[in-house]
Amino acid sequence: MALRFPRFSQGLAQDPTTRRIWFGIATAHDFESHDDITEERLYQNIFASHFGQLAIIFLWTSGNLFHVAWQGNFESWVQDPLHVRPIAHAIWDPHFGQPAVEAFTRGGALGPVNIAYSGVYQWWYTIGLRTNEDLYTGALFLLFLSAISLIAGWLHLQPKWKPSVSWFKNAESRLNHHLSGLFGVSSLAWTGHLVHVAIPASRGEYVRWNNLLDVLPHPQGLGPLFTGQWNLYAQNPDSSSHLFGTSQGAGTAILTLLGGFHPQTQSLWLTDMAHHHLAIAFIFLVAGHMYRTNFGIGHSMKDLLDAHIPPGGRLGRGHKGLYDTINNSLHFQLGLALASLGVITSLVAQHMYSLPAYAFIAQDFTTQAALYTHHQYIAGFIMTGAFAHGAIFFIRDYSPEQNEDNVLARMLDHKEAIISHLSWASLFLGFHTLGLYVHNDVMLAFGTPEKQILIEPIFAQWIQSAHGKTSYGFDVLLSSTNGPAFNAGRSIWLPGWLNAVNETSNSLFLTIGPGDFLVHHAIALGLHTTTLILVKGALDARGSKLMPDKKDFGYSFPCDGPGRGGTCDISAWDAFYLAVFWMLNTIGWVTFYWHWKHITLWQGNVSQFNESSTYLMGWLRDYLWLNSSQLINGYNPFGMNSLSVWAWMFLFGHLVWATGFMFLISWRGYWQELIETLAWAHERTPLANLIRWRDKPVALSIVQARLVGLAHFSVGYIFTYAAFLIASTSGKFG
């Protein structure tokens, strides 16, 4: 018999039903569950696949550069970044005739194009690229890296080049390599690029390979470095009248601590960023020399963790046993990596708009909105993934004997207290926040807006004041004009910071009031509830009072049959599934808040947000309905416009989202009956019955249907909001 899909599971390959296909797809990447897998092959497969992942990333980024160089308008955008719309790529086949062609021919293009809202133009401009040739060179270089990655992946699957398990478990060498080799050296290299290429470009000097060795990035060269006069590199920075990309108002400093923003580009000073990357490089290069490898000096991770036993005895045996637990569990390591990456991605979202690093990106409002929303959604998915793999760790890899009375075991011992506290916090936040919103809503409805309960966020305002915001009138720390910190800040460090905090043209420490107080607590409710579901899923993954033997059923089981009541919907997978809905819900509130606050800021009518955000109808009417009006315009006698594609995507997103409920609310029996009826009809229909199938069609399992429903719900939700966000922002600001 020929080998059938899936080859990695003979049990599944022999399944006579369509379950074979779905279960095969579902377990294709669960290497641990494959036939004849060994620990060594598991590690080697994952290692090789990382190179494939890198190849895809390099190919994708190469494609961005290539298409902009080929079909974009980078060179004309560089001449006038604030008024030329950046083109992502051409549209080959604009449907709906001449009106469509006219609607999408923009940005000085000859034919229909897509506008770029990703910020790549601003990024490339900031780092010193100026011509299409530069973009092509970058695309070719990334294509080369992609090919190298593919070759490396293939190579590490060959017998002679397969690393051993001991190599993968050498934690100290990996730490040193990642800290020094990846973070340290790459940060140092980036500092080099900024100093040698980007900063000269911002001052009108074009540095390329042909003159790299001739142009001194600083008039005194390396002299100050070797003589210890490092402060010379900070002297004579660009002036506040500097025109970016020209020598007008330019200085000679390369490593500064100016603080605040370049007045023209509204982005951080390039010389500050070079300084930042140099500091990061130094820290990581040192960190990457701290762990004991071949030379018998430095820290041993195992010794470090075993020594972490709090003397008071409150944490039992502390971190004893954790080294082997983490080092032998890929799921634990992945959980830690995802948790870190999730936090970082959300921090990127928060910092990209408040401290914009790229020239002129702060004035490209649609790009700002798109990047914030994009990074928050990515962060949400990564964070839920961290808990999912944490739960799989508890089911597949956790050993009670190895972790006796350490912090991990004590987490499990105290899980009732942890879960009930999260539950209490969620209930408190939910009822109080909803109570305030509903009360205010009713007061507005009955025509007595003065009876709203409006709470001023005084603690948050105090924190903003401590960082230098003076408008609230708190005389504290950096907002205290006669304090030592304030005076030092004027001269010694970051003199531009206090100006930036108190300017109204940027997004640093936006002025906040009762509407912010309420939505902050709504978001806190979402975060705590999502966390509650995820933490409960992981801590109850091995078992609970209701189902003590849960770990024997694996990560995702629907129920333990009809004989055990209450065992449905309590697998660790179900917790992940439910948490994703809450995660999407929470990020919805986060992005609504960010977008509405910024639209009113950019339009100069902040009072709209301040007055309408304190009650539910305000959010529904003045944010959602008002901003979606262009998208629900429908057919009109004026034909197409450049927002039509977003209007279509808005509709289509709703369709995909609603389709999710078909999978989420109806279950197997209904579909099984329908499938059997359709199969009967198929077999009796001329021509159609020439096509036969070997697998008996069966309905999706409960868990699979949930996954398909969740996927449609998520994709539709994000499509809908993306269309709304981009259309409502670009429709207002062009």
Swiss-Prot record:
GO cellular component, one term: photosystem I
Spans traversing the lipid bilayer: 46-69, 135-158, 175-199, 273-291, 330-353, 369-395, 417-439, 517-535, 575-596, 643-665, 707-727
Cited function: PsaA and PsaB bind P700, the primary electron donor of photosystem I (PSI), as well as the electron acceptors A0, A1 and FX. PSI is a plastocyanin-ferredoxin oxidoreductase, converting photonic excitation into a charge separation, which transfers an electron from the donor P700 chlorophyll pair to the spectroscopically characterized acceptors A0, A1, FX, FA and FB in turn. Oxidized P700 is reduced on the lumenal side of the thylakoid membrane by plastocyanin.
Alphabetical list of PROSITE patterns matching this protein: PHOTOSYSTEM_I_PSAAB
Subcellular location(s) of the protein: Plastid, Chloroplast thylakoid membrane
GO molecular function: 4 iron, 4 sulfur cluster binding; chlorophyll binding; electron transfer activity; magnesium ion binding; oxidoreductase activity
HAMAP family (alphabetical): PSI_PsaB (MF_00482)
NCBIfam families, per the entry: psaB (TIGR01336)
Keyword field contains Disulfide bond: no
EC code: 1.97.1.12
Oligomeric form and interacting partners: The PsaA/B heterodimer binds the P700 chlorophyll special pair and subsequent electron acceptors. PSI consists of a core antenna complex that captures photons, and an electron transfer chain that converts photonic excitation into a charge separation. The eukaryotic PSI reaction center is composed of at least 11 subunits.
Source species: Daucus carota
Record field: catalytic activity: reduced [plastocyanin] + hnu + oxidized [2Fe-2S]-[ferredoxin] = oxidized [plastocyanin] + reduced [2Fe-2S]-[ferredoxin]
Magnesium as UniProt keyword: yes
List of residues binding [4Fe-4S] cluster: 559, 568
Signal peptide: none
UniProt name for this protein: Photosystem I P700 chlorophyll a apoprotein A2
Binding site for chlorophyll a B1: 654
